[in-house]
C-alpha cells in the first residue's frame, strides 16, 4: 500500500512526500513501476552516437519529473524532490541499473544550467525555466568558448551593451554543443571592457530563435555535428534574462563549469545489466567480439573495469560534495580526468579487439575511437584540470598572470 500511495502521488504530479525515508529497494520498485507503466524507451546509445532521438529522452524525463526522480535534490516545485545529498546518491545508484534513452541533448540544462539557476537565478527565472528543463520540454546549450577564448575563457569578446532595460549583443561563439536542438543558451558576455577580464563579464540567457542569432554546425571527424558556431549580430534581450549581477558573470560561469566537471544532475541512467551480470554492458559487448578470450585480454578488461568503477565513484563523490556543500570543488576536475581516461581506454580496447574490422564504420568502438581525442578537450582540457588540482588541492603556486589587474581592452591591444 505504501508504494501504491507513492504512485498515486506521482500521478498527481506532487512528487514523493517521504523521499528521504525510502530504502534502496523501495526506490528500485518505484522506478521500475514508473518506467514499466509508462512504457519508457529502453534504448541506450553512446554519447555522440545516436543521441538525436529527442522524443525518447523527452518521454523519459516527462515521466520521471512527476516524482522528481531525475533531479531529486531540486525543490519539488521545480521538478525535484527536495532530497538530501545522501538520498540523492542512493537514487543515482539505483537509477544506473536501468537502461534509459540517451539524454545527451538535455545534459547541459539538467547538469549545469539548472544548478546555476538554483544558486544565482531569480525566483522568476527559476519558476520560468527549471520545471521545463527537468521535464525535457526545454533544451539549453552553453555559449562560452570563442575562437580566441577557449582555455583562456575569461578572454571572451562577445559584447553586451545595455540600452535601457535591454541588452544588445554582438560577437561569435564556437564549439557550442547542442545548439541545433536548444531553445535557450546560457551565454557569457563582456559588459565592461575597462575592467580586468575576469571582472567585466555578465551571464545571460538567450533564446536561440532570436533575430540576429545564427547557428552553423561544425562537422567532426566522427561525422557528428553536435558542435556549432553561433554568430550574434545585434540581438536584443531583456534585462530579465540576466543571470546574476552585472559584472558577476565569471562567478556564475565557475558554478556552471564546476557542475559540468562534477557531472552533477545530468544522469543518463545506466546499462541495465548491473544487477544481473554485475558487469557493465560494454564488457558484454567486448565479449561478443572474441571467442577464445586470452588471459592477456581478460587482464586488460579487468584493469579497465577497475578504472571505470573508480571513475564512477570519483564522479559520484564529486557530485555528492557539490550538492552537500552547495559549491562544487576541485574534486570535479579529478572526476573529469578519470572519466576521460576510462572512456578512452574502453574505446581503444574495443577498437583493437575488433582487429582490421575496427577500421570500418560498423565495427564496435569505431565511433567511440574517433570521439575519444575530443574528450581531453571538451569541458575543459586535461591541462586545465591538472592546473586546478595542482593549485587548489596540492597548494602549488599558480601560473603567472600578468593581465590579472589590467583592463581587458588594454590586454587585447597588447599593452602588457
Task: Annotate each language-model stretch with its function.
Residues 165-166, 170-218:
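A short core secondary-structure module
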Residues 158-161:
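A structural signal for short hydrophobic beta-strand segments in well-ordered beta-sheet cores
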Residues 1-108, 125-128, 132-135, 294-302, ...:
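Amphipathic, small/basic residue-rich leader segments at the start of a protein or domain
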Residues 298-303, 330-337:
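Short, charged, amphipathic alpha-helical segments
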Residues 65-136, 178-184, 308, 315, ...:
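Internal helix-loop-helix
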